[in-house]
């Protein structure tokens, strides 16, 4: 830190941070916001001199992600990007690029202004070398400048839905001495360090739940944790209420839309079966009123 007399410390992150026993531990869990009075005593710190560094959050279920606020102990990155995955890390899409010099760091990427809420641009507002500490990088998934006509549309829902969030730092800010002297000891003066990383969102239930519980196998005692197992209603089931309950396949599964619950509907098998499946051809043939087909009919019945 430029304002401190002593500039070099030996870090030991083998054990978690402790105010007195291990104050020089800088593990990634230190970025979890506590809002405690001593929050500036702990931070995450990257390896010295390394420019390409990644922080990845792997969530236990689908979530609605709304915004990210990162508070840095060091200079903010000269270049970075935020990415998302909605299929547990199989594929990734860029949310936004950030750079002091967008054209140099991310050539070919528009610098805006945004024309649509899902435009991918490079933002220069959060990449200045000043302040040298406690500078923020802020990202909102839905820019308040855009009026969202239908928040339940697939386009908006897909923008919000994540299972993984990845922040890639690609360029360090330096004071220029590394350009005159390429020795490792010069480069090692620079690194990324973060006090807080606030990730805001809520459990993702397609409108079929109003509360969430802990996912099986995950701790429920983490303070402030948003749980990922939806307490499903409207005859739905699954971690995210993404399926109809068994024997509720008379209508296709749909997400709720505003005041319309789009609840799954029970099949009508006249008491001769407890199993059914949805058939789109049957649904369309009935004028989109009933698509449930009874399976394993009993009592000498069929159809």
Curated annotation (Swiss-Prot):
It comes from the Eukaryota. InterPro entries: Laminin/Netrin_ECM, Laminin_N, LE_dom. GO terms for cellular component: basement membrane; extracellular space; laminin complex; laminin-1 complex; laminin-10 complex; laminin-2 complex; laminin-8 complex; perinuclear region of cytoplasm. Its main location: secreted. It is found in: Secreted, Extracellular space, Extracellular matrix, Basement membrane. Disulfide bonds join 203-212, 205-230, 232-241, 244-264, 267-276, 269-294. Keywords: Basement membrane, Cell adhesion, Disulfide bond, Extracellular matrix, Glycoprotein, Laminin EGF-like domain, Repeat, Secreted. Glycans are attached at residues 52, 288. SMART domains: EGF_Lam, LamNT. One of its GO terms (molecular function) is extracellular matrix structural constituent. Residues 1-202 form the Laminin N-terminal domain. SUPFAM superfamilies: EGF/Laminin (SSF57196). Residues 202-303 are annotated as: Domain V. Residues 203-266, 267-303 form the Laminin EGF-like domain. One of its GO terms (biological process) is cell migration. Binding to cells via a high affinity receptor, laminin is thought to mediate the attachment, migration and organization of cells into tissues during embryonic development by interacting with other extracellular matrix components. Laminin is a complex glycoprotein, consisting of three different polypeptide chains (alpha, beta, gamma), which are bound to each other by disulfide bonds into a cross-shaped molecule comprising one long and three short arms with globules at each end. Beta-1 is a subunit of laminin-1 (laminin-111 or EHS laminin), laminin-2 (laminin-211 or merosin), laminin-6 (laminin-311 or K-laminin), laminin-8 (laminin-411), laminin-10 (laminin-511) and laminin-12 (laminin-213). Interacts with ITGB1. This is Laminin subunit beta-1. It comes from Gallus gallus.
């Amino acid at each position: 830190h430029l304002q401190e007399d002593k500039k070099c410390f030996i870090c030991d992150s083998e054990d978690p941070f402790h105010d007195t026993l291990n104050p020089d531990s800088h593990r990634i869990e230190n970025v979890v916001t506590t809002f405690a009075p001593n929050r500036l005593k702990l931070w995450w710190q990257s390896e010295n001199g390394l420019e390409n560094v990644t922080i990845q959050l792997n969530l236990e279920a689908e979530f609605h992600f709304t915004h990210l606020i990162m508070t840095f102990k060091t200079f903010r990155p000269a270049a970075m990007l935020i990415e998302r995955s909605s299929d547990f890390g199989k594929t990734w899409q860029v949310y936004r690029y950030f750079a002091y010099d967008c054209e140099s760091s991310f050539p070919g990427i528009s610098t805006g202004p945004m024309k649509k809420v899902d435009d991918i641009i490079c933002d220069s507002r959060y990449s200045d070398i000043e302040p040298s500490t406690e500078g923020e990088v802020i990202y909102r998934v839905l820019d308040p400048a855009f009026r969202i006509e239908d928040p339940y549309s697939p386009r908006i829902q897909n923008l919000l839905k994540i299972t993984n969030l990845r922040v890639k730092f690609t360029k360090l800010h330096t004071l220029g001495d590394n350009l005159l002297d390429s020795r490792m000891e010069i480069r090692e003066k620079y690194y990324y360090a973060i006090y807080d990383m606030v990730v805001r969102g809520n459990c993702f239930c397609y409108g079929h739940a109003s509360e969430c519980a802990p996912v099986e196998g995950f701790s429920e005692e983490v303070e402030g944790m948003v749980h990922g197992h939806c307490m499903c209603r409207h005859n739905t089931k699954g971690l995210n209420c993404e399926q109809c309950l068994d024997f509720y396949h008379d209508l296709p599964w749909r997400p709720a839309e505003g005041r319309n619950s789009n609840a799954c509907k029970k099949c009508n098998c006249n008491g001769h079966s407890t199993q059914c499946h949805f058939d789109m051809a049957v649904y369309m043939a009935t004028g989109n009123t009933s698509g449930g087909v009874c399976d394993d009919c009993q009592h000498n019945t069929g159809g």
